[in-house]
């Protein structure tokens, strides 16, 4: 059971996990772990399933998925019958009213929908993956010089599950560098997997870029793929000025993660998010929601 903190009710909700039995089998059973290492974590598995989700055959999965996870389609720009395949539905866009944004210069917004963890005063060699597991930022981006700039800063981990809106956005106005790609495996980013695979973020396929924001300084953006996420699509134009809330890119089918690193003393994350992280809980947030300030 995965409990997520609800900021509105100030209580904990139980996360509905797509494919829970499969995840438990793959990461907690001896046979499942063997199958995971031999096949599931490999590119071929995600590519095969991705091809299916890109085909018209996958269209029949859409309504059942919406019904099972109670997805509010009134927020979407398309009707159910307008989607060409499951990936088209998965990467759906929302109406502008669905995710209101506070454009105040001192307000930090969430880059996407998901479950947020916040870690302050980070040690580059011991960045927290999940309680009890750490990794090296230098290894994550394979660039020690850039990594060193974020010593003592803040790390935000936004975990997306398959039921979420899967587009990610810029948290401020500014310009972003070209995204650098790092090949890797396709482990799940579900907490069950994070508790069973050390340095998972450093092992998975990922991309990173530097966002020079107007109000929060230099921000390191990292997008991490996961099982069945064969593609991370960047839709922004490198070095072209963007506005706060504009789309940066999106993930195709599967759970996935966006990680942001801020330099020391550039932001202050909302206290409820920080406190829940210390207690070992993620906080549910939506794109555009206020999560901190200067």
Swiss-Prot record:
Is synthesized initially as an inactive proenzyme. Formation of the active enzyme involves a self-maturation process in which the active site pyruvoyl group is generated from an internal serine residue via an autocatalytic post-translational modification. Two non-identical subunits are generated from the proenzyme in this reaction, and the pyruvate is formed at the N-terminus of the alpha chain, which is derived from the carboxyl end of the proenzyme. Binds 1 pyruvoyl group covalently per subunit. Its cofactor is pyruvate. One of its GO terms (biological process) is phosphatidylethanolamine biosynthetic process. The active site is at 113 (charge relay system), 169 (charge relay system), 256 (charge relay system), 256 (schiff-base intermediate with substrate). Its EC number is 4.1.1.65. It is a peripheral membrane protein. Its main location: membrane. Transmembrane segments: none annotated. The record marks 255-256 as: Cleavage (non-hydrolytic). GO terms for molecular function: phosphatidylserine decarboxylase activity. The modification Pyruvic acid (Ser) is found at residue 256. It is found in: Cell membrane. Keywords: Cell membrane, Decarboxylase, Lipid biosynthesis, Lipid metabolism, Lyase, Membrane, Phospholipid biosynthesis, Phospholipid metabolism, Pyruvate, Zymogen. GO terms for cellular component: plasma membrane. Catalyzes the formation of phosphatidylethanolamine (PtdEtn) from phosphatidylserine (PtdSer). This is Phosphatidylserine decarboxylase proenzyme.
